[in-house]
Amino acid sequence: SSGIGLEIANNLANRGYNLVLTARREDRLTSISKEISEKFKVKVDFISCDLSDINSPRQIFNFCNDKNYKIEVLINNAGYGIKSPFHETPMEDEEDFIRVLGTSVIALTKIFLPSMMESRNGKIMIVSSVASFSPPSSIQALYGPIKTFMNRFSDSININYNHLGISSTALCPGFTVTEFHTASGVQDEMDRVPSFLKFSAERIAKEGVDAMFAGKPICVPTMTYKILVFMLKSFPASIL
């Protein structure tokens, strides 16, 4: 309903795709569904749910199935950060975090894969992060490791299902101007990031969607972050 996810929705609608949107904020979903539908002349439906609820992926699938929606493109984008140090964060919060960023991605992909296999056509995007290539951080202890796992999971989908016309793209943006940092309580840190390292959600979405339709397994948007990731891969973590 905001940030990269909203811009991906706009990009797909501009390509003529009908959309099923999901997020927690029903009021936002109502307004943006109307805006996108009127602007791009496509059908937009939505279901409000919280992916920290283990039942949400099945609820999303049932919603689409009951309405006979055929999902050709699956965007796994939900995410947030945890500001508190790992040792101070309640385990319940860590479990919710893992469900939103990890388990729900696996569940949604697993649930929608069979119909893609049947049609021998499907595009999947998993919104990961440049943090997946970075050394461990003193804060956000789980964020980078989960994103690294998501990259590997995306690779696994490609290895197992490319021959059936299904591809998965891990989109790995760097700092992006969205509500993410405010919602995660780390806006102060974002404000200190140099402007040349910050990019618009619209640009990130465009590069990601282009890469997804091109069947690329991974997309690191902008030359700035391509160079950074090359350096992260080239040098040992001990000297970074």
Role assignments for model-derived ranges:
Residues 85-87, 93-98:
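Substrate-binding pocket helix/loop in short-chain dehydrogenase/reductase
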Residues 109, 146:
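Active-site helix of classical SDR
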Residues 15-31:
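Conserved glycine-rich Rossmann-like NAD(P)H-binding loop of the short-chain dehydrogenase/reductase
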Residues 170, 191-228:
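C-terminal helical subdomain
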Residues 77-82:
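Conserved NAD(P)H cofactor-binding loop of Rossmann-fold oxidoreductase domains
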Residues 1-19:
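Canonical Rossmann dinucleotide-binding motif of NAD(H)/NADP(H)-dependent dehydrogenases/reductases
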Residues 129:
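Residue(s) in the substrate-gating loop at a strand-loop-helix junction
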